[in-house]
Amino acid sequence: MSVRTYRDISRRVSRKIRVGSVFVGGDAPVSVQTMTNTLTTDVAATVAQIRRAQEAGADIVRVSCPDEESTAALKAIISQVEVPIVADIHFHYKRAIEAAEAGAACLRINPGNIGSAERVREVVRAAKDHGCSMRIGVNAGSLEKELLEKYGEPCPEAMVESALSHARILEDNDFTEFKISVKASDAFLAVAAYKALAEACDYPLHLGITEAGGLRGGTVKSAIGIGSMLWAGIGDTIRVSLSAQPEEEVKVGFEILKSLNLRHRGVRVVSCPSCARQGFDVIKTVEVLESRLSHIQTPITLSIIGCVVNGPGEARETDIGLTGGGNLAKEGALNKVYVSGIPDHTINNEAMVDHLVALVEKKAAEIEALEAARKAKEPATAAE
């Protein structure tokens, strides 16, 4: 428990499963997923896209396997990437078996559309034989006909009933290495369904607002939907669904987690919207800095505030801070640089971007060195 208890999030207690090398649920960090949008049969393009997603921080990547040619390509894809791969399967139970044999870490299936009980048993057998976990993926847009007839429309009750009935199918086959999602494009519906499901079971939950929209609108909708659930302690892994490239989904996912102090990766910029008091062009400065610092993976906070109204206060709370020294029209004004929350020196507008990049890179190197030293000391401490 921290001193600032208003920041604490009490996460729902869930079971822990493995998706390849990544743990999901239990005390594991909330993982970030995305999905490729290339033709899976185009191995080179799919591998390149997965690698870009991985560079952005993706923990897990899903790949669609609609046909035999796609599952045939899966083995070559998996051999060339480092992140665990989830095979997205619908309707064809043989695709699930083929994906497991190809090395998929997880099978995203809907047991209700895989086929007969015997076919489900075959899929479970393949998953067990090859160390695959599964995701039961319920979607408001594809609920079973009988549930729509029972409830009249997609609703939280129908989605939870679908999820739990599918969970029982796997449980009846002595398989519990699975997570569940109950997605909808309506954030209200999705949140209500996830909250009800969280009360009804202890399986890890994969969060998402499906078909959320384009980069801007989808980001806002996902931040509200996924963010509100995470804030309530619900959720073990997330996928931000955007009509955008997979790496953009990953970046948005991490921004949501960073905002809630659940995961930290890279530079978190605190910046003002700017006004007539700004001592430098805040908007342009932030844009350039975010681009030039995108390679940093070490968690660091950087405040960029255009004037002294809020600048010093924000700088005290960040690793590196910059506060504008006067009106933009005032030539020769010097801006104050803060290091570890303490006023350290001044810098002019012309040199400040290069200077801040150097400071952040130096700070990142220091943090990385300390972490490496700590890890190197752990075995020696344990041996003593």
From Swiss-Prot:
Q: Which Pfam families match?
A: GcpE
Enumerate the residues binding [4Fe-4S] cluster. Answer: C272, C275, C307, E314
Cite the cofactor comment.
Answer: Binds 1 [4Fe-4S] cluster.
Keyword Membrane: yes or no?
Answer: no
| Presence of keyword Iron-sulfur | yes
Necessary cofactors: [4Fe-4S] cluster
Give the catalytic activity: (2E)-4-hydroxy-3-methylbut-2-enyl diphosphate + oxidized [flavodoxin] + H2O + 2 H(+) = 2-C-methyl-D-erythritol 2,4-cyclic diphosphate + reduced [flavodoxin]
The record's listing under SUPFAM superfamilies reads:
Dihydropteroate synthetase-like, Nitrite and sulphite reductase 4Fe-4S domain-like
**What is one process in the GO biological process aspect for this record?**
isopentenyl diphosphate biosynthetic process, methylerythritol 4-phosphate pathway
Q: What pathway is this protein a component of?
A: Isoprenoid biosynthesis; isopentenyl diphosphate biosynthesis via DXP pathway; isopentenyl diphosphate from 1-deoxy-D-xylulose 5-phosphate: step 5/6
Under Gene Ontology molecular function, one entry of this record is: 4-hydroxy-3-methylbut-2-en-1-yl diphosphate synthase activity (ferredoxin)
Coiled-coil stretches, from where to where? none
- Keywords linked to the UniProt accession: 4Fe-4S, Iron, Iron-sulfur, Isoprene biosynthesis, Metal-binding, Oxidoreductase
Q: What is this protein for, i.e. what is its function?
A: Converts 2C-methyl-D-erythritol 2,4-cyclodiphosphate (ME-2,4cPP) into 1-hydroxy-2-methyl-2-(E)-butenyl 4-diphosphate.
What family name appears in the similarity comment? Belongs to the IspG family.
Under what name is this protein listed?
A: 4-hydroxy-3-methylbut-2-en-1-yl diphosphate synthase (flavodoxin)
Organism whose genome encodes this protein: Rhodospirillum rubrum (strain ATCC 11170 / ATH 1.1.1 / DSM 467 / LMG 4362 / NCIMB 8255 / S1)
**Gene, per the UniProt record:** ispG
